[in-house]
Amino acid sequence: MKKLVSMLAVLLIAVLAIAALDFTFVDDTYNKDIDDQKVYDTLKGMLSEAKTNEEKAEVLWRLSRVCVDLGDELDDGEKNAKFALYEEGEAYALQSIEANPNAMAYLWKCANIGRWGQTKGIMNSLKKADPMKEDLKVVTDRFNCLDSSECWYTLAILFDSLPGVFGGDSNFAISYARAACDTIPSYVIYGGTYKALAEMLYKRDWSAKKRATEIGKMQTKWSKETKSNYAKYGYYEGANGADATPIWTKTKLGSMSDRQEALVILKYAQAVYDAAKYHTDGDEDNYEEIQELIAEWST
């Protein structure tokens, strides 16, 4: 009898394993940027195959994610088509949250809204900023998701884009951008993330002396901030103090200026690209822009 029960248990596990949706193909195809339309079409088919709310949520947030890329691929002149895709992506994220609340759904909801806002123009989409911040707080605090480069990048771009009177903050943006760079997965390049941080630093333009002082202040605030991850990571630049050395240089943060570090970051991003065996179309576009900035900032 025990043997029969064991056999039935093994059989049940095998059946469940077969029945469970396999996202390996769509995730690999998405990460390699091979064919976003194929990813979209495959996920639409998988949606009808999803048996549980958990599976539906997994399909839906991935649909939301690929809508961002599909919208980005359209020409700037195709604004209505872009708006439609970003709105579709937001709708998928909302459905994912309804099916089974999860960090990725909140993240890609914000990513779609953010792209919608960038397309519309920041001054025409200010009312979306605070709801985005609240959703991203859910990612960092309710789900304690601190290793999502995309989440930190979205926060960085949001705080960098907003005027100060509407909640923008260049220092918070740089801290979030540093967190985004520090959490880039090993299987992607994300040159645009490095470029974003470099551009923010170049624009801030602090001297080495000022950096040493201000990063020291941030370190104190980082240590004292206990209310939320969202608030704490606004001081991430000072997490390890002015003597910290980021991955792209052996020079201490307090011993170089913003613009010196910005150039080093771009050269590091260039090296990451050169070392990679596979490049997406987005990687190639970022590489060209990075090379142009290196040439401009080196003169």
Per-segment meaning from a language model:
Residues A20-D28, E54-D76, N100-K120, C145-P163, ...:
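Amphipathic alpha-helical repeat scaffolds of TPR domains
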Residues D160-G164, F172-A180, W206:
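Solenoidal tandem-repeat scaffolds enriched in leucines and small polar residues
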Residues L43-A50, C67, A93, N100, ...:
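Alpha-helical junction/boundary sensor with strong preference for TPR arrays
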Residues Q37-V59, L63-R65, L70-G77, A81-L85, ...:
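Internal amphipathic alpha-helical repeat/solenoid segments
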Residues M1-L4:
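Positively charged n-region of N-terminal signal peptides that target proteins for export
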Residues L8-L16:
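Bacterial N-terminal signal peptides
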Residues K127-E134, D169-C181, I215-K232, T251-Y278:
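TPR/TPR-like (Sel1-like) alpha-helical repeat modules
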Residues T29-G45, E78-L94, S125-D135, G167-Y176, ...:
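Helix-turn-helix repeat elements of alpha-solenoid scaffolds
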